[in-house]
Design a protein with these regions (language model features):
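Conserved beta-strand hairpin/beta-sheet module of binuclear metal-dependent hydrolase folds
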Residues: 3-57, 154-166
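Short Pro/Gly-enriched beta-strand edge/turn motifs at strand-loop
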Residues: 13-21, 110-112, 135-140
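Short, flexible loop segments at the rims of nucleotide/cofactor-binding pockets, characterized by
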Residues: 18-25, 41-45, 65-68, 140-144, ...
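Active-site neighborhood of phospho(di)ester-bond hydrolases with catalytic His/Asp-centered motifs
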Residues: 42-45, 63-71, 89-93, 144-147, ...
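Active-site environment of divalent metal-dependent phosphoester hydrolases
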Residues: 47-49, 70-76, 96-99, 150-152, ...
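Active-site HxH/HxHxD metal-binding segment of metal-dependent hydrolases
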Residues: 48-132
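Metallo-beta-lactamase
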Residues: 141-146, 150-207
Length: 207
């Protein structure tokens, strides 16, 4: 499957680039955007799109992979990217065991995304200094936002006022909840996020 769309937020050395891929295009929940900020990737995309993802990433310098949570569309290719780019991905502490040992996924999710591969990760700290290339560094803050998943962590770049929201925000209203989602935690996490001073939100599904 080819790249469906590309996204570019031009801001000099702090520019963000993304590409959308997916086996199906039945709505925003069946495609996925991998974002790149300099030499850092935000999430790894689904395994059944690896041929496309590999083709895009192969010529790029990638030194850091940040995983927002363990779900297969976000973490699926972390193992492959770690080998391709010789890096150790960062992941939230609460998701590391599932990423390392694997976990069952429902049939529908396997059809849409494929099955995630086990991957060794290092713990995503509360603050991390990352390279953006050309001797440019910036700080990212990990913001725990449980509700959609216990380990869901949003990534806040205070200097650029960027928020990478994982699956925290996809649409303006919820039509249904997954069986493992917690509505009260979702609301509390949203309230936490609106206290942050961000100007641009990057959603891996909506854009």
């Amino acid at each position: 499957m080819a790249v469906r769309n590309t996204y570019d937020h031009e801001n000099g050395p702090h520019s963000v680039h993304g590409f959308r891929t997916g086996r199906f295009d039945f709505g925003i929940n069946t495609t996925f955007i991998i974002y790149r900020l300099g030499e850092t990737l935000i999430d790894a995309g689904p395994t059944n799109q690896w041929s496309t993802i590999k083709r895009v990433l192969k010529p790029l310098t990638i030194k850091t992979l940040l995983i927002t949570h363990h779900h297969e569309d976000h973490s699926g290719n972390a193992n492959r990217i770690s080998k391709l780019k010789k890096l150790l991905p960062y992941a939230p502490l609460l998701g590391q065991e599932k990423l390392a040992k694997g976990y069952p996924t429902p049939l529908l999710q396997k059809i849409i995304w494929g099955s995630p591969l086990k991957v060794k990760t290092q713990t995503l700290p509360e603050q991390l200094v990352i390279n953006q290339g050309l001797d440019c560094q910036t700080t990212v803050m990990a913001i725990p936002t449980p509700g959609h998943a216990k380990d869901l962590t949003c990534l806040f770049f205070p200097e650029q006022k960027y928020l990478f929201s994982g699956d925290m925000y996809i649409s303006k209203s919820l039509k249904y909840l997954r069986s493992d989602e917690n509505l009260s935690q979702l609301i509390a996490s949203l309230r936490k996020l609106i206290e942050l001073d961000f100007d641009i939100l990057f959603c891996p599904h909506r854009g």
